[in-house]
């Protein structure tokens, strides 16, 4: 396939244009009066959302050169979502503004390397000021406020998330799932979460969110590494005959075994996900046993004379109502009352409490307390309902955003919302030292760019951007901001309009990182459009292979 190369000014122009296309689509969702975006799905009704990263990821531009720019800003939205869980729209708006302003400086003939140095100094100073003015989350009401703002002003969502955190603790496990009715409910169920995710991204069942979700799976617990597939064949065939999915938790899975599991998963012969066991050494064995008790299964270990190749039915496998696996975490959920499991869990908790009393190591005590909390506290499930499937999915997106924002707030605290935290933090730049005039240009660019979130929120509310920015510029109160819901100037903290510090910080860092890369780019290589058209007319890959799922491949 031949390539086309675009250089210098034309390259930058195309990239900036592509960034602007995505930023315009994402930016309209910002703030309480931001608009929803309808995203066409490959099947079923369109997805209606205000989630910035969902909007960004749905964009694929026909013009290859423009699409390179689009991918830049999609990457900033994705990175912000991965780190902070929220703030993707703010990051996109800032990145768009920063790229345009930095490009103006280069076009004007200013030394762009010095401009970038000045801008980098400015970003560091602003982030330090934001952190300095951050306040810790003190109570349930502040948690509800963060969740309410992040969910587009939905107070019910804020209160439900605060209630869930109250029941399982601020560091407890909270999941989101569809309700089977119209209601929005909080339910605390048996379950646990540990810090290990899938071994390969090819196990993800939801490619948009990159997670694996299984209903009523079997759980195979192995105290060993698996490299060859043959020992797994009997148990895989037994599970495949039931039609249920399988969660494999082992020391490690690699080589031929991993390849075979991925192949059969993609083929549809068996739904499976492989996860590394949590912990290390003896602690790993204890945690596997914790999971076994919770799921009513057994740990397959040769130390007890149980060989993997001899497991040819599901009797030694655990079960769960639901398992959710991300690249970093695995959550096991039960919502069925089982008195036998309850007794075993209580007995296990008592054993751990005794071990806590006996140990003299602070580190060991901390790890035992973590295990106890995982077994005892359970999992809070936010069950989201809606009158229609479209309404339910839209609300579920907002609940997930709000939950991420709340976690970020618990982690690093909160600052005044509505874009004013960055707006007022930019004042530290007035006294920031610089080495030359070109660096001063970079500092001033960041100062201007930090108005972008406030301007976008006001614009989406139908207000006058310049009037609001001018009014806030006169204020000596760093909590004073513009409430886009009421179109009034208020004390943002007292009004409950707050943002997680981590979200604000991450949005600025990621936006500037991408803007710097764009300005450093002077050429791009893309496929020729004619080649793409030729390929599309040439038929499908593989020339017409047909057939059913068949058996498993080993």
From Swiss-Prot:
Keywords for this protein: ATP-binding, Chaperone, Cytoplasm, Isomerase, Nucleotide-binding, Stress response
EC number(s) per entry: 5.6.1.7
Region (Disordered): 528-554
Gene Ontology cellular-component annotations: cytoplasm
Gene Ontology molecular function, alphabetical: ATP binding; ATP-dependent protein folding chaperone; isomerase activity; unfolded protein binding
Reactions accelerated catalytically: ATP + H2O + a folded polypeptide = ADP + phosphate + an unfolded polypeptide
GO terms for biological process, alphabetical: protein refolding
Compositionally biased residues, Gly residues: 537-554
Keyword Isomerase annotated: yes
Taxonomy, superkingdom: Bacteria
Cited InterPro entries: Chaperonin_Cpn60_CS, Cpn60/GroEL, Cpn60/GroEL/TCP-1, GroEL-like_apical_dom_sf, GROEL-like_equatorial_sf, TCP-1-like_intermed_sf
Annotated compartments: Cytoplasm
Family, per entry: Belongs to the chaperonin (HSP60) family.
Assembly with partners or alone: Forms a cylinder of 14 subunits composed of two heptameric rings stacked back-to-back. Interacts with the co-chaperonin GroES.
PANTHER family: 60 KDA HEAT SHOCK PROTEIN, MITOCHONDRIAL
Name of the protein in its database record: Chaperonin GroEL
Source organism per UniProt: Orientia tsutsugamushi (strain Boryong)
């Amino acid at each position: 396939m031949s390539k086309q190369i675009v250089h210098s000014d034309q390259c930058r122009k195309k990239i900036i244009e592509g960034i602007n296309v995505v930023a315009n689509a994402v930016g309209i969702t910002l703030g309480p009066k931001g608009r929803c975006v309808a995203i066409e799905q490959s099947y079923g009704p369109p997805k209606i959302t205000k989630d910035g990263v969902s909007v960004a990821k749905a964009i694929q531009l026909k013009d290859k050169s423009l699409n390179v720019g689009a991918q830049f800003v999609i990457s900033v939205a994705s990175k912000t979502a991965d780190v902070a869980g929220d703030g993707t729209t703010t990051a996109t708006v800032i990145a768009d503004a920063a790229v345009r302003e930095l490009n103006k400086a280069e076009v004007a003939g200013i030394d762009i390397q010095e401009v970038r140095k000045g801008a980098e100094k400015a970003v560091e100073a602003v982030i330090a000021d934001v952190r300095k003015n951050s306040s810790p989350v003190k109570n349930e009401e502040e948690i509800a406020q963060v969740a309410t703002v992040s969910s587009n002003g939905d107070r019910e969502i804020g209160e439900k998330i605060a209630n869930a955190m109250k029941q399982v603790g601020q560091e407890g496990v909270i999941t989101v799932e569809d309700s089977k009715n119209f209601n929005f409910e909080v339910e605390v169920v048996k379950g646990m979460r540990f810090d290990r995710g899938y071994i390969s991204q090819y196990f993800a069942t939801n490619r948009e969110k990159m997670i694996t979700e299984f209903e009523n799976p079997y759980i195979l617990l192995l105290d060993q590494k698996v490299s060859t597939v043959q020992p797994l064949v009997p148990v895989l065939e037994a599970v495949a005959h039931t039609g249920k999915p399988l969660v494999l938790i082992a020391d490690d899975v690699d080589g031929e075994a991993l390849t075979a599991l991925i192949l059969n998963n993609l083929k549809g012969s068996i739904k499976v996900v492989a996860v590394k066991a949590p912990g290390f050494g003896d602690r790993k064995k204890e945690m596997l046993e914790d999971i076994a008790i919770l799921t009513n299964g057994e740990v397959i270990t040769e130390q007890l004379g149980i060989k993997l190749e001899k497991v040819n039915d599901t009797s030694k496998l655990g079960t769960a109502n639901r398992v959710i696996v991300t690249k970093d975490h695995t959550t096991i959920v039960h919502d069925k009352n089982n008195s036998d499991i309850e007794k075993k869990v209580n007995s296990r908790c008592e054993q751990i409490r005794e071990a806590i009393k006996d140990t003299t190591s602070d580190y060991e005590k901390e790890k035992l307390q973590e295990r106890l909390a995982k077994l005892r506290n359970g999992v809070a499930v936010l069950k989201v309902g809606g009158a229609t499937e479209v309404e339910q999915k839209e609300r579920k997106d907002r609940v997930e955003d709000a939950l991420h924002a709340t976690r970020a707030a618990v982690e690093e605290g909160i600052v005044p919302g509505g874009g004013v935290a960055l707006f007022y933090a930019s004042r530290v730049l007035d006294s920031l030292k610089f080495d030359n005039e070109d660096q001063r240009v970079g500092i001033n660019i960041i100062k201007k760019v930090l108005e972008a979130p406030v301007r976008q929120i006001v614009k989406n509310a139908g207000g006058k951007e310049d009037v609001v920015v001018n009014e806030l510029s006169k204020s000596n109160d760093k909590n004073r901001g513009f409430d886009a819901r009421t179109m009034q100037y208020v004390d943002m903290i007292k009004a409950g309009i707050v943002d997680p510090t981590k979200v604000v910080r991450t949005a600025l860092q990621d936006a500037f990182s991408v803007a710097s890369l764009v300005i450093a780019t002077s050429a791009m290589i893309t496929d020729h459009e004619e080649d793409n058209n030729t390929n599309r007319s040439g038929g499908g890959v593989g020339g017409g292979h047909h057939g059913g799922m068949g058996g498993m491949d080993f």
